[in-house]
């Protein structure tokens, strides 16, 4: 059986600094039978000139649609049997397309495939290194049989993508969890999703504290929690393992203990908790957190040293804290929604008197 023809779709918005590296990597790919479609989401720079210089098919959205809308537009014009989505700030390896083609050629029951970032992030600063390395570790240690999808570098059979309607840009107009939600639909439709750990790509993004918090909380944690509650589907993989859930709860208890510490030192609450008991409880929680996450912290020590890992632990526990808070608040919102909808009742008729049907 011959390898499938591939269509590589690259959504981009003002990507003049990163798009050339992305397209150059595709141009020197070891795989031969593929096309590249650059979907320009109303950029104001020279994106078109860059795309045409590298021989890519150029498409432009009628208005700003976000990456999900750009991918959908590219898919509508693609000629390949397999659609490969590559972010404009991603550099594929020479063998990346070969791996995708091989997966779909040899495993006819596979509907979608995705990979991970590599362990050599482009930017040397701590936050960019940590964020991309944590992504690499989570994907590389997760099950190969996934129930979600990742569009940073992921592929879907064209017929499956079109049958399911592509990315839901009505629900997720901004870059969010539109890829995860599509993965849910693929899985619920009976499709198989493969996490191919050979597919590793370089991420060119430089992370900032503000950008990380916005992405982690507003663009990921909140919509993903709502999706989990709506579908009642909590996949115990990637960032949602039992140990991750338990760690989030423990970090919440740790924060509570640290908040109580000044009051206990001042003599408050002595009737029901003493300083030695609180100190011991905090120490036990810290020990449990270190034990639960020992593998990833040992992995960081081996690759970046003790000092880097100490910072990684603090950022990791911060992630557990705000993710746990988001889940708790969204769960409360989910519980209260039926009561709120019942209180609102039927919609009012605002037509003038005598005009109602």
Language-model features: where?
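A conserved acidic beta->alpha catalytic loop
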Residues: 25, 32, 40-48, 63, ...
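N-proximal low-complexity "stem/linker" segments adjacent to membrane-targeting elements
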Residues: 1-28
């Amino acid at each position: 059986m011959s390898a499938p023809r591939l269509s590589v779709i690259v959504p981009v918005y003002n990507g003049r600094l990163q798009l050339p590296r992305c397209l150059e990597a595709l141009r020197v790919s070891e795989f031969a039978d593929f096309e590249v479609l650059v979907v320009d989401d109303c950029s104001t720079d020279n994106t078109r000139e860059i795309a045409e210089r590298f021989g890519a098919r150029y498409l432009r959205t009628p208005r700003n649609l976000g990456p999900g809308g750009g991918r959908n537009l590219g898919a509508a014009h693609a000629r390949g049997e397999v659609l490969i989505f590559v972010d404009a700030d991603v550099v594929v390896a020479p063998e990346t397309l070969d791996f995708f083609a091989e997966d779909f050629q040899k495993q006819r029951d596979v509907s979608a495939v995705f990979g991970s970032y590599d362990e050599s992030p482009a930017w040397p600063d701590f936050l960019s290194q940590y964020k991309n390395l944590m992504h690499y570790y989570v994907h590389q240690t997760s099950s190969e049989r996934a129930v979600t999808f990742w569009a940073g570098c992921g592929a879907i059979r064209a017929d499956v993508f079109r049958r399911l309607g592509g990315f839901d840009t009505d629900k997720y107009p901004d870059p969010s969890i539109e890829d995860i939600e599509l993965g849910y639909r693929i899985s619920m439709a009976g499709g198989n999703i493969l996490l191919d750990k050979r597919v590793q790509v370089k991420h060119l993004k430089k992370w900032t504290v503000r950008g990380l918090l916005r992405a982690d909380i507003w663009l990921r944690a909140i919509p993903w929690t709502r999706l989990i509650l709506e579908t009642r589907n909590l996949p115990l993989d990637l960032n949602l393992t039992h140990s991750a859930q338990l760690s989030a709860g423990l970090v919440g208890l740790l924060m509570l203990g640290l908040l109580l510490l000044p009051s206990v030192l001042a003599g408050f609450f002595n009737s029901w908790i003493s300083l030695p008991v609180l100190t011991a409880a905090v120490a036990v929680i810290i020990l449990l957190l270190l034990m639960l996450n020992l593998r990833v912290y040992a992995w960081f020590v081996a690759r970046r040293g003790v000092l880097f890992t100490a910072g990684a632990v603090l950022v990791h526990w911060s992630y557990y804290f705000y993710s746990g808070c988001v889940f708790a608040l969204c769960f409360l919102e989910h519980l209260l929604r039926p009561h709120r909808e019942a209180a609102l009742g039927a919609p009012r008729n605002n037509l003038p008197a005598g005009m109602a049907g």
